[in-house]
């Protein structure tokens, strides 16, 4: 029988996921660096996105359900003038504003953003991991098949304009589980009448955990003792771990 690889570590690593890696790839690199036997993450970030990825080791994987259901906070950059099939910069352009599009006026943008605060309905994107008949929607999308998706109600607790250039805007969004920031960007563009897609995304908070305490993969791999980056079980907020 093959020997089980890794050490039985327990704890949470707050990882600042770099651009270009899938969440699972980032998790596996962290797991190897820590030499952990068991690891899982608590919510996928797209490869183009960066920011807070909770990597749970050993018994800390028991918080995964709570963190999947937790509220999240993001910093998102919207690109105005073009809509893509995926809702982000990785997709194919499917609609464009006129060539003489002058950009968005700040007053209009602020007014539109205010409409998206509170309880809103979103239609999940085709490029998502939601399943239909056991198959992820993105597989249908890649085959050129568009399926009807019922809208889902989500909560936008805060949506704040951080910076603005006319053709791009950076916003801070605090939202409930199941919120698609790509869809939010697309819907904002449609409400403005000029189209938009998500140009960049950075997750800054998951439940009680903040990006402020996160470590990059490079920094983790450079540490003399990478295990020192783990939050121990007794450091986790009270009530997060289920009773044993």
From Swiss-Prot:
Transmembrane segments: none annotated. Pfam families: TruB_C_2, TruB_N. It is an enzyme of class 5 (isomerase). InterPro entries: PsdUridine_synth_cat_dom_sf, PsdUridine_synth_N, tRNA_psdUridine_synth_TruB, TruB_C. GO terms for biological process: mRNA pseudouridine synthesis; tRNA pseudouridine synthesis. It comes from the Bacteria. Keywords: Isomerase, tRNA processing. The active site is at 46 (nucleophile). It catalyses: uridine(55) in tRNA = pseudouridine(55) in tRNA. SUPFAM superfamilies: Pseudouridine synthase. GO terms for molecular function: RNA binding; tRNA pseudouridine(55) synthase activity. The keyword Acetylation does not apply. Its EC number is 5.4.99.25. Responsible for synthesis of pseudouridine from uracil-55 in the psi GC loop of transfer RNAs. Belongs to the pseudouridine synthase TruB family. Type 1 subfamily. This is tRNA pseudouridine synthase B.
């Amino acid at each position: 029988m093959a020997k089980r690889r890794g050490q039985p570590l327990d704890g949470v690593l707050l990882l600042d996921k770099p651009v270009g890696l899938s969440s699972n790839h980032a998790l596996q690199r962290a797991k190897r660096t820590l030499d952990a036997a068991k690891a899982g993450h608590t919510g996928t970030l797209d490869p183009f996105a960066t920011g807070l990825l909770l990597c749970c080791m050993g018994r800390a994987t028991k918080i995964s359900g709570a963190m999947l259901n937790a509220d999240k906070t993001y910093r998102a950059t919207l690109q105005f003038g073009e809509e893509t099939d995926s809702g982000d910069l990785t997709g194919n352009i499917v609609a464009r504003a006129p060539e003489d599009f002058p950009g968005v006026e700040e007053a209009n943008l602020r007014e539109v953003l205010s409409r998206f605060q509170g309880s809103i309905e979103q239609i999940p994107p085709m490029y998502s991991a939601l399943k239909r008949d056991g198959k992820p929607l993105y597989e249908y999308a890649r085959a050129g098949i568009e399926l009807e998706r019922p809208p889902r109600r989500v909560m936008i607790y805060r949506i704040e304009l951080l910076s603005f250039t006319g053709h791009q805007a950076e916003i801070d969004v605090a939202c409930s589980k199941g919120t698609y920031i790509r869809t939010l960007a697309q819907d904002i563009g449609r409400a403005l009448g000029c189209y938009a897609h998500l140009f960049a995304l950075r997750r800054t908070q998951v439940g009680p955990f903040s990006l402020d305490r996160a470590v990059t993969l490079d920094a983790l791999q450079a540490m003399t003792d990478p295990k020192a980056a783990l939050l121990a079980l007794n450091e986790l907020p009270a009530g997060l771990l289920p009773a044993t």
